[in-house]
């Protein structure tokens, strides 16, 4: 009683099916204020950790560039979040990590109740869907203006970098390699964000980040 047994059987699957499920609205809502408070706390903690790292990471100027860039993105994301009119957003069954992998997509420990656009934003950021597919999902799911604003703010918020800065040793060789890959991908990421902004701006007026 009150337990569910999950078993795994590797089989053919379609990633789009999981994304469609994540967009189905639940009879639950998430508070925008709590999202903002969470992001502010993450940003503050990351800034503190970054300050500690900056004084002892030698010969790794990429880290300094990344830290300023991603802190700027985080602050921009919170600023966009302030454009949302409603106090709550519709929730869906989302994933902590949205990866095109059957076991990860089905793993109960990887599921979370959050705004129903979380997986959609992660899929675009991780290059799992194109901007054309992103727009199709927006139309099919009939996202509200506030959900579109939140979607854009999620695209901006640098969760991956913040998680590395907070939870990992940025002096570690493997982490440095990951950070270097991020640094080398900045231009592509900027272009992807601009393309998304141009598309989303057709549905509602979104603030433009001048330095992107």
Per-region residue spans from a language model:
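ATP-dependent phospho-/nucleotidyl transfer catalytic cores
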Residues: 4-6, 31-93, 206-210
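ATP-binding pocket architecture of kinase catalytic cores
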Residues: 1-31
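Short, mixed-charge aromatic SLiMs
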Residues: 38-46, 140-147, 177-191
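Central hydrophobic cores of alpha-helical transmembrane segments
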Residues: 150-157
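Active-site acidic catalytic loop and adjacent metal/ATP-binding pocket
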Residues: 70, 78-120
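Active-site Asp-x-Gly
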Residues: 102-149
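Alpha-helical structural elements of signaling/regulatory helical domains
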Residues: 27, 31, 55-58, 62, ...
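ATP/Mg2+ or Mg2+-diphosphate-binding catalytic cores
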Residues: 162-212
């Amino acid at each position: 009683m009150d337990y569910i047994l999950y078993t795994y059987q590797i089989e053919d699957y379609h990633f789009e099916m999981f994304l469609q499920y994540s967009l189905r609205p639940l009879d639950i809502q998430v508070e925008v204020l709590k999202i903002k408070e969470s992001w502010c706390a993450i940003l503050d903690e990351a800034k503190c950790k970054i300050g500690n790292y900056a004084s002892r990471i030698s010969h790794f100027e990429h880290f300094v560039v990344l830290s300023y860039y991603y802190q700027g993105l985080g602050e921009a994301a919170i600023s966009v979040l302030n454009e949302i009119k409603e106090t709550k957003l519709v929730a869906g069954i989302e994933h902590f990590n949205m990866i095109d992998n059957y076991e990860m997509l089905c793993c109960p420990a990887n599921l979370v109740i959050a705004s129903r656009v979380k997986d959609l934003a992660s899929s675009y950021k991780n290059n799992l869907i194109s901007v054309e597919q992103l727009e199709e999902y927006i139309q099919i799911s009939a996202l509200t203006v506030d959900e579109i604003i939140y979607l854009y703010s999620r695209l901006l918020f640098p969760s991956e970098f913040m998680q590395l800065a907070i939870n990992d040793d940025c002096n570690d060789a493997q982490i440095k390699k990951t950070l270097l890959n991020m640094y080398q991908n900045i231009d592509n990421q900027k272009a992807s964000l601009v393309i998304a902004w141009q598309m989303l701006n057709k549905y509602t007026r979104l603030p433009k980040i001048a330095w992107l």
